[in-house]
Amino acid sequence: MNETKKYLVIKAIAQGKKTKKRACVELNLSERQINRPLLAYQQKGKEAFRHGNRNRKPKHAIPDEIKERILKKYLSYETYKPNVLHFCELLAEEEGIKLSDTTVRKILYKKNILSPKSHRKTKKRVRKQAKLNLNQPLDNPILPTAKDFLEDPKKVHPSRPRKKFAGELIQMDASPHAWFGPETTNLHLAIDDASGNILGAYFDKQETLNAYYHVLEQILANHGIPLQMKTDKRTVFTYQASNSKKMEDDSYTQFGYACHQLGILLETTSIPQAKGRVERLNQTLQSRLPIELERNKIHTLEEANTFLLSYIQTFNEQFGNKTKLSVFEEAPNPSERNLILARLAERVVDSGHHIRFQNRCYIPTEQGKEVYFIRKTKALVLKAFDGDIYLNIADKIYHTKELLDHELYSKNFEQEPEQKKERRKYIPPQTHPWKLTSFKQYLHKNKKDYEEFTSEEIHSPQLQV
């Protein structure tokens, strides 16, 4: 009961301004219960209504020394500020202080220190309390009605349950952020909708097809073939196709055909809420991962990608593994995946019996010997996942040999160097999916039509990657 109200009512009784029966109704007490505070008022006055524990520190209260250590530790993070839950984990790991996130949050808020993940409403409330120097939360006297909270039907994106099986739906996205150092890099991610596990992660300078191929390779190697993938429509998968008619520039077709050969249903969406799992994962990692990278002194893309391999396992143990039911299918072997995760380009053989790709010339080879095709023979160039170049001519795949600008040695003035024995390369079978006819059928089905480029039609002096 409010001490002030009780004091004013009892005071009115003592002064003869109010009857005991009226006081019983106002304070919801019996007449006997009214007599006790009335007697105390006559003996002690207003002090009789002061609670005995006021200004007394509880036995379970956190010592001021611990609070100072917590504040000093949080303020020591200069580049990246952790959210409160992550900070509690760091406190337990580095300082041996084990407190709940609610307790730590109250300590920080009392000093007007806000978490980087605080909501706008919380920031406004804390600032208002600091300005008015109040210890109790402020109440808004104007109460809204339920109608004021109804959402516009066009903006409604209701929550949905997770999928039942792991591998039933994979959400993919790239998150640009200053993950380490001042420069912005892109973290490409794939998360399983059912289990909440990160299935693949890869850093690159930009959002690239190569990075998504690395993520897909991690999924295939560690888990298998999923049923469906959902990606952002405004990403590397679509924006290049509108600016170029070159096949190799259409990342969506390249990635889509790889998924088509694996039997993965690829879906794109422009609505962030439609792939909320990966969007929330981006926010979580933007808060946590930069601190872990800084703690481990990670400064390069190579170091960051190596660190991700162990970090994903730790992250999944803490936040994932929500289901063990799986519908992942067995993935192709590494040699087959190397060709499935490839870049494609249409070329024709020129009068020098070679094709030109990315400002370099290549001649098809078979069992180490050069194979010469007639001029204008159509070829499908395959830049494999490991960077090797293959040619598909009449549905037969050939290895290639790069045509150098100058000879490596002079037969007239130098001794011929010893020839290193080449390792036996994987030769795809005739049933391999990268067939020109099947690829053209896929293009036709997706209403794609690309012009063919001869080697003489490419004159850019810069190497395209």
UniProtKB/Swiss-Prot annotation:
One Pfam family in the UniProt entry: HTH_29
Biological process annotations from GO: DNA integration; DNA recombination; transposition
Residue stretches spanning the membrane: none
Positions of the Integrase catalytic domain: 157-340
Gene Ontology molecular functions: DNA binding
Entry-linked Gene3D superfamilies: Ribonuclease H-like superfamily/Ribonuclease H
Keywords, comma-separated and alphabetical: DNA recombination, DNA-binding, Transposable element, Transposition
InterPro entries reported for this sequence: Homeodomain-like_sf, Integrase_cat-core, ISNCY_transpos, RNaseH-like_sf, RNaseH_sf
Function: Required for the transposition of the insertion element.
More details: Found only in encapsulated strains, not involved in capsule production.
Protein name as catalogued: Transposase for insertion sequence IS1202
Species this chain originates from: Streptococcus pneumoniae
Lineage: Bacteria, Bacillati, Bacillota, Bacilli, Lactobacillales
